[in-house]
Every structure is written in C-alpha cells, then in structure tokens.
C-alpha cells in the first residue's frame, strides 16, 4: 500500500521504495544512498522540518547496514504532525551515506554515534569521529560480526 508521501514522490519522479506502514501507521520508505541527500533536501522543503531521530542497525552479520531517519512535519494549526520513516541501506566495503547535517543540524551527534558503533561513514559530515568509544578503539561494537576483545583497558577514567 502506497502512502501519501510515496505517491507525492512518484508524482515528481523521485525514485524510492515504499516499505508500507509501521505499527503506528507511520509511512516507511527506502531511499538509495546516492539519492538520499537530494531527497532529504526535498523533504525539508516539503515541510519535514524536524529530525526526530536517526539510528542505525546491522541487518545481517557481515552484510547489510541500515541508517534510519524519523522525520516530522510540524506546522502551525495542525493538531497531528505528519511523520515518515526513511531507511537507507548500505552494503559492501564502502559503507557510506551522504550526511544530512547540513539539512537538519540535529543529525550531528546521531550520525556520529552510528559511525562510532557500526562504522557507517557519513560523507560531508563536519566532525565525523568517534563519540562514545576512544579514538584508538578498533572495530565497530554493534556489528553482528564484531569480535569483542578479551580485555578492556580503562582509559582516562576520572
């Protein structure tokens, strides 16, 4: 079943894949990594002015990673804000997605956390570096194929 936003994107020739609706009735769309930045700008102009959250997860060991964006359209005089969930999947040796920091500034720490935990690179992010783990940490702790070290060294504990 195609939602309102999906129909609008089709009408304007923007390539995506409708993933239906979640349990709350929020429309979910899949966007290709190479199209994500331009579609993000279009969604912002269309009225999705609030990035509620960005997260990422590992779909399968050694394979597909997903970056998930929950966008909200907030306007004066509207009782129920319109929401959409966008999923961008990456796979292979080049795990990169265009950063949407320049569209929604609130993506800053959220994209950095996804990078730190799963190793997804966000192109054109101004400060893409580890945020939770030390810079010297090797690997991506939330990947399903991550092998935890035998020991942990407490560093810079204050």
UniProtKB/Swiss-Prot annotation:
Which residues are connected by disulfide bridges in this protein? Answer: none
* InterPro entries, sorted: NADH_DH_suC, NADH_quin_OxRdtase_su_C/D-like, NADH_UbQ_OxRdtase_30kDa_su, NADH_UbQ_OxRdtase_CS
Q: How does it sit in the membrane?
A: Peripheral membrane protein
What's its top-level EC category?
A: translocase
Q: Which residues form a coiled coil?
A: none
> From its record, what is one biological process in GO terms?
photosynthesis, light reaction
Superkingdom: Eukaryota
Keyword annotations for this protein, in alphabetical order, are:
Chloroplast, Membrane, NAD, NADP, Plastid, Plastoquinone, Quinone, Thylakoid, Translocase, Transport
- Its catalytic activity? a plastoquinone + NADH + (n+1) H(+)(in) = a plastoquinol + NAD(+) + n H(+)(out); a plastoquinone + NADPH + (n+1) H(+)(in) = a plastoquinol + NADP(+) + n H(+)(out)
User: What's a Pfam family this protein contains?
Assistant: Complex1_30kDa
Any idea where this protein resides?
A: Plastid, Chloroplast thylakoid membrane
**How is this protein organized at the quaternary level?**
NDH is composed of at least 16 different subunits, 5 of which are encoded in the nucleus.
The record's comment on protein family reads: Belongs to the complex I 30 kDa subunit family.
Its biological purpose is as follows: NDH shuttles electrons from NAD(P)H:plastoquinone, via FMN and iron-sulfur (Fe-S) centers, to quinones in the photosynthetic chain and possibly in a chloroplast respiratory chain. The immediate electron acceptor for the enzyme in this species is believed to be plastoquinone. Couples the redox reaction to proton translocation, and thus conserves the redox energy in a proton gradient.
> Protein name, please?
NAD(P)H-quinone oxidoreductase subunit J, chloroplastic
User: Taxonomic lineage of this organism?
Assistant: Eukaryota, Viridiplantae, Streptophyta, Embryophyta, Tracheophyta
């Amino acid at each position: 079943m195609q939602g309102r936003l999906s129909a609008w994107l089709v009408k304007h020739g923007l390539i995506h894949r409708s993933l239906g609706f979640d349990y709350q009735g929020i429309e979910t769309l899949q966007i290709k990594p190479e199209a994500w930045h331009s579609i993000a700008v279009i969604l912002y102009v269309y009225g999705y002015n609030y990035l509620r959250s960005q997260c990422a997860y590992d779909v399968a060991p050694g394979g597909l990673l997903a970056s998930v964006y929950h966008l909200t359209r907030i306007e004066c005089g509207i009782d129920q804000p319109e929401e959409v969930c966008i999923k961008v999947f990456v796979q292979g040796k080049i795990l990169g997605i265009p950063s949407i920091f320049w569209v929604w500034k609130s993506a800053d720490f959220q994209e950095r956390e996804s990078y730190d935990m799963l190793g997804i690179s966000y192109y054109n992010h101004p400060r893409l570096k580890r945020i939770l783990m030390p810079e010297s940490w090797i690997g991506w702790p939330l990947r399903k194929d991550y092998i935890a070290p035998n020991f942990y060294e407490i560093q810079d504990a204050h």
